[in-house]
């Protein structure tokens, strides 16, 4: 019976792959090998961010610098941050994840987050992961929130609960990438609300 169930599962996966083939998160080509999430030829293209990096925000720094200039000059409302890849090596991929309907990319990136940043995340001792929400109008257009997909892909693998309803975006803000530093800070003021829920903070 178990062999039959396994066979049915493999058949189902094969049918899904044929009808909805997985796309490589780098080149966006169809991944031909079953069970793989990225093309063999693209495996080395996403460049992992290597030290030295800022001890506060994770931004790349010069040799011998503990903190980047921004973190030396400004107080931030977070303890620590880390980046996984060099920006230029995944910029087009992340754009397709956010705006091109390639939600399956999140599974690959969630897996990579756990593999390379899992120890860092566990050392922080998080009680939960809270993805930044999209405004309901933007989510309706996009069909999903890429931050939530990434959070679930990583959180499920690490057995960390993901609270996607803890925050609500109450103001449809302008895209951050179009703004300068001061405008970005003002853009997010009063943009979020914490509704009544059963989650204990």
Residue positions per predicted region:
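Glycine-rich phosphate/pyrophosphate-handling loop used in enzymes and phosphotransfer proteins
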Residues: 1-201
């Amino acid at each position: 019976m178990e062999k039959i169930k396994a066979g049915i599962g493999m058949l189902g996966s094969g049918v899904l792959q044929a009808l909805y083939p997985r796309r490589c998160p780098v080149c966006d080509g169809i991944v031909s090998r079953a069970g793989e999430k990225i093309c063999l030829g693209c495996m080395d293209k996403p460049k992992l961010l290597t030290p030295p990096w800022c001890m506060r925000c994770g931004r790349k720094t010069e040799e011998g610098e503990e903190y980047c200039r921004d973190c030396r000059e400004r107080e931030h409302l977070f303890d620590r941050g880390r980046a996984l890849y060099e920006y230029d090596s995944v910029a087009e991929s992340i754009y397709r994840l956010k705006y091109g309907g390639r939600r399956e990319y999140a599974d690959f990136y969630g897996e990579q987050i756990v593999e390379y940043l899992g120890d860092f995340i566990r050392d922080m001792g998080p009680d939960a992961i809270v993805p930044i929400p999209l405004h309901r109008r933007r989510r309706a257009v996009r069909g999903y929130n890429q931050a939530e997909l990434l959070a679930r892909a990583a959180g499920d693998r690490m057995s960390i609960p993901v609270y996607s309803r803890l925050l609500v975006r109450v103001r449809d803000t302008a895209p951050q990438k179009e703004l300068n530093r001061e405008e970005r800070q003002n853009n997010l003021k009063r943009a979020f609300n914490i509704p009544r829920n059963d989650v204990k903070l």
